[in-house]
Amino acid sequence: MTTKAELIKDVVSADATRKKDMIRAAEMYANSDAIKKTSKRVEAMKTCRNVIKYAIAFADNSDTNITAKKLLQINTCKNRFCSGCQKAKAINDALDITTLSRYLTQEKKYRPLFITLTIPNITGDELDNAIRKMNKDIDKLFKRKYYQENMKAWIVKLEVTRNKENNTYHPHFHILAFVHKSYFYERNADSFISIPMLRKDWQEVSNDERITQVDIRKAKGRTKADREKAVLELAKYTAKSSDFLDSQEVFDTMYNALKGKQVIRFCGELSVLKKVYDFDKYGLFEKYAPKTEEMPELTHRLQLDWHKDVYEKSISELNEDEKKELARTVECETDKDFADTYFDDLHKLYQTEQKIEMIDTTDANEIEKEVLENELKNLKRKKSECNRKLKVMEYVAKNMYANFKLKEFESEYDFLKAMDLL
């Protein structure tokens, strides 16, 4: 339960401040001559969060203080440079990182390391190519022997900051790496990665001896909560609105440099675990997810409608449909449901392969050939997606059976036998 009551005016003020930044970003996006855009995307940015609905609970004998709120409805644009969507993405990333980190530290007994990798500041014209190169260089780094031996899983987050005094940009990586707990007891071993060693290796893969600023350290904190709080630093924004909203030139530079780039990557053992996490309907990670605090009964709706540079607020009692939606819970599927889904996907793969074999362009004219080639391309993409999902499901079946919340099979043996994976 929320420990400190919030004033409605403070909730409205916080959303309004964010909305004004969003409007400025939308205007820069619309006015840019350097960005490829569509009228649909421009409109989506301009109208993002125009209507926000919260379910709220009032403090006793108050119609201004609220003790809890939960988002009921919102329209979003999902643009990386929209500050409202940035915040939502950061919250989701924080949940993902916390849950997966807990899984690795509790199930695998791994321990987290923080790594920072930088390059010297660069100009705006160099930013796009520099980020592309950094993404390739970090892959080279983690393929080196010492890193492969030690790093079991790692999350790479790109951040770009700007020096306003000399108008240069500073792209850098924050990395959360997971190592076996014995790593910290072998500081004198050849496989231990020191700061000088990390600097030398990063200079070599980057082919840049000017690099001086790198760091590697154990996640610190007196309590488990303190250590988890440090881990969440990884979820902060890739680019701050105070930087990219400084001018049209800066906005264009950062937008084009970051467009299409993967700014957070889950690697090593996390490459498959993140895929499992994304399709989890079976409670596989439930015990590792942050617990939501119990809320008081939510009784009213706070609706914010953006109009002429302000949010107009209205408060009314929740209707029956809204109450039902708030009370709705999603039931976990069982291990039997998982097995059925696996065989359904196997059947889809078989059907796709059959369709691919049947396509023959030998006697087709140019128009027919183009249609068939496009169909073949789509089928091959579908086949690849099926294969990837099946591999992830096989990983779950062989490694995570104990984590199923609801089980219909009598044993793991029966489960694997039913899936024909013994």
Describe every region a protein language model picked out.
Residues I175:
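Cys/His-coordinated zinc-finger cores
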